[in-house]
Amino acid sequence: ISIVGADITDSIEMLCTFCKYLLKDCDFSAADRETQMLLIGIQKCRLQYRFQNSLLPQLIEQMQTRPEQLELVLGDKMIHLERALLGWQQELTCNELNDYQPELQHGGKAMAYREDALYANLQRIYQENPTAKYFGSFGAAHVQMTRYVGDGTVYWIDDCFVSRMAGGESFLDGTLTVIHGIVTHE
């Protein structure tokens, strides 16, 4: 099973748990001492603020400056770490564009950024393996191609994720099916 990371990563807890999962059965001995210590720290980390404020910035820096050390440990799992870290960086940008409010503002810059990120991430993943079958579950805002009612309010996201995938400029070459937020492509 390949974990396809099209959506942005909006939870530090989820990112920490995912990193621990990726490191679960890895052999750290091939990496240099600094990388080993970082990965052991992540693996044993119990405090969210330590992960967020210390270990995660080190991991991002390591990915940017010496990714080969991480690849020695992760091997084929490296792509999943890359996607998760990209998703986290996209979440930080989205939060900044949304003025750090908890809910995305419909019609705002953050909503448009998130739709762009979803589309670009899936496009990148699809280019890596265009013959695969993809399945995903997305919120109504990402998949409704017409107005929809939520909490008594009518919402509409211009150029939403699924509208782009179904449009004439789409990178997809198969059948796209959307039923109540479930997206499949064959």
Where are the regions that the model predicts?
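Compositional signal for N-terminal targeting/processing segments
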Residues: 1-186
